[in-house]
Amino acid sequence: MLTIKDIENFKETFNDETPLGEPQHWIYLKSGRSLEITHEENGIPESKQYFSIRLHCSEEEFNNGDYYKTCGVITTLTATTAQDTLNCINAIMRTFKEMED
């Protein structure tokens, strides 16, 4: 799982990037779902940049049409600090009873 230090150093520790070049990290969960953490920065002044944390449904849930209208996104939270980002990740994991794969 990500630590505060990982989030603070996101440019070095995140394992992917968006098509817009924004740092992104994926956490794959035992349920088949995934957690996407993106540093939203493209076209945003540095003082207003933030992290988005999205829980994506599993392939099976998507194929069943469960989250088709939301493009597979179950929930989204946003945060501006590393601590708030970690709190959002933990809140999603607790609320949806998820475990890292």
What would you call each of these model-derived segments?
Residues 9, 15, 42, 63-64, ...:
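Detector for Asparagine
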